[in-house]
Design a protein with these regions (language model features):
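Eukaryotic RNA-binding helical-repeat scaffolds
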Residues: 1-464
Length: 464
């Protein structure tokens, strides 16, 4: 070994090594001595004198793998990486499936957020290879696209053709990654979701509890029930019965919360969640009980009270309940689109005659925030928003911008659907103002007329 290292050092000193050889030597010395090796630094110094634009695809791959092995050397070679990214974009059309997945994996592990042009180019190339990726390669590709927050409709189309052919046979983690990708990107594909739902019924016993959760959660997030929903959730219930103690507390909470988003009520298991033993487990696990976890617990509790009157299990103790589901960052409600809200507000002032006749961003006693609340008396007249007595009817306007829907279809996300469902049960009249209707209105007069037809369809409009 000493003679081999000595000989390599001599050839390195003489400058006889090409890029591929330098990469091989760098990998070997990283394994022997780590990233602080003097010889590795010498290798990198010689590589930096080269012009990446002149490298072959094989040399480019070797260099990416070297940098990945040392996790980018803590950002010391940003200029080199950027030059490599620029060159890689020009040769993606020559990349096979293994190279595409490998490079996306490298970009992910090095967190190359500045390399989006390359990520986009690799995604386009991946479309041609979707049917040819191995399970491991496809999982890498999907993981990278989730990491960088990218997808395009050509890739989605290719996945819709491929998933029905692989859902029953691919590695469980690959199938799980498919569902995670569509869920993370808010892409509702009935073709994909139905195929995975069918395979879930037959394969769920071989899945880990984490895989079960990650396959079920997108159904709740996107508010979609497959045709075989009864079989799917019966299988979920069976797994919960047989492997309840195997679930991590947060994972279990995510599964049960996803169920209620699509009106599946796991009553037998919710009672266990509200036990002091489970809540103690939640506190002891990792991040403990953060505000999002408390919101999930509170919404589960509200669901039991509103939709499951036959629930007789323990109550959620008051110290675990929150007052608002609308929180910064990860939230059980999507904040109102400000531009859309301002346009609706302007129309409401003209319709109702004054700003005082409706409340904005009103926190209800039931944790949900109302975009707009209008109060009516017994005769149907609008009351000032400040009135609390003589209120006979409450109207909640849901000003639904694009972020409240799946990215490719006009379907509300699960968290928005449950909000509107609960508000109806609590006595509110729900009136939706979807962006795709409102955006068609061309002037203030049409806005006011639209709002009048939505809110007061059976009454004449007064002119102020």
């Amino acid at each position: 070994m000493v003679r081999l290292v000595s000989g390599s050092q001599e050839r390195l000193d003489q400058g006889y090594l090409n890029i591929a050889q330098l990469c091989d030597l760098g990998q070997a010395m990283l394994a022997l001595e780590g990233p602080d090796s003097v010889m590795v630094e010498q290798v990198m110094s010689q590589i930096q004198k080269q012009e990446p634009a002149q490298w072959s695809l094989a040399e480019l791959r070797a260099m990416y793998k070297l940098l990945q092995s040392a996790v980018g050397f803590d950002g010391k070679y940003c200029d080199l990486l950027n030059a490599m990214h620029t060159h890689a974009v020009t040769v993606t059309s020559h990349m096979n499936s293994a190279t595409v997945s490998e490079l996306l994996g490298v970009l992910t592990s090095l967190d190359q957020t500045q390399a989006m042009p390359l990520v986009i180019s690799l995604c386009k190339r991946a479309v041609r290879h979707v049917a040819h990726f191995t399970d491991e390669e496809l999982a890498l590709v999907l993981g990278a696209l989730m990491h960088f927050g990218h997808s395009d409709h050509y890739f989605v189309d290719a996945m819709e053709k491929h998933v029905p052919t692989m859902a029953f046979t691919s590695h469980p983690e690959t199938v799980t990654k498919v569902m995670q990708f569509f869920g993370r990107r808010n892409i509702l594909s009935p073709v994909v979701f139905n195929a995975v739902a069918e395979s879930f019924v037959y394969r769920a016993e071989e899945y880990t509890t984490s895989q079960v959760a990650r396959q079920i959660m997108p159904f709740g997030k996107l508010g979609y029930l497959p045709p075989n929903a009864a079989d799917v959730f019966r299988k979920v219930e069976t797994i919960l019965h047989t492997r309840f103690s195997h679930f991590q507390p947060r994972t279990l909470l995510n599964v049960l919360h996803s169920c209620i988003l699509v009106e599946r009520f796991p009553v037998n298991f919710v009672s266990k969640l509200f036990s002091s033993y489970f809540l103690q487990q939640l506190q002891e696990q990792g991040t403990g009980i953060d505000r999002y976890v408390l919101a999930q617990l509170t919404q589960l509790y509200m669901t039991m009270k509103l939709e499951c009157p036959y629930y007789e299990g323990p109550r959620l103790l008051s110290q675990y309940r929150i007052k608002s589901f609308l929180t910064p960052g990860h939230s059980l409600e999507t904040p109102v689109d400000i531009h859309l809200y301002n346009s609706v507000k302007s129309g409401l002032v003209d319709l109702l005659g004054a700003r005082s006749y409706f409340g904005s961003k009103v926190l209800s006693p039931y944790c949900y925030t109302l975009d707009v609340e209008i109060k009516l008396d017994e005769d149907g007249y609008v009351l000032p928003a400040s009135y609390h007595d003589e209120v006979h009817k409450r109207i909640a306007l849901c000003i639904d911008g694009p972020k409240r829907y799946t990215s490719n279809k006009r379907q509300l996300l699960g968290k928005e659907a449950i909000k509107q469902r609960h508000l109806r049960l609590l006595g509110y009249e729900i009136i939706q103002i979807p962006f795709y209707e409102f955006d068609k209105l061309r002037n203030q007069a049409s806005v006011v007329e639209y709002l009048h037809q939505k809110i007061f369809p059976h009454s004449y409009r007064l002119s102020w």
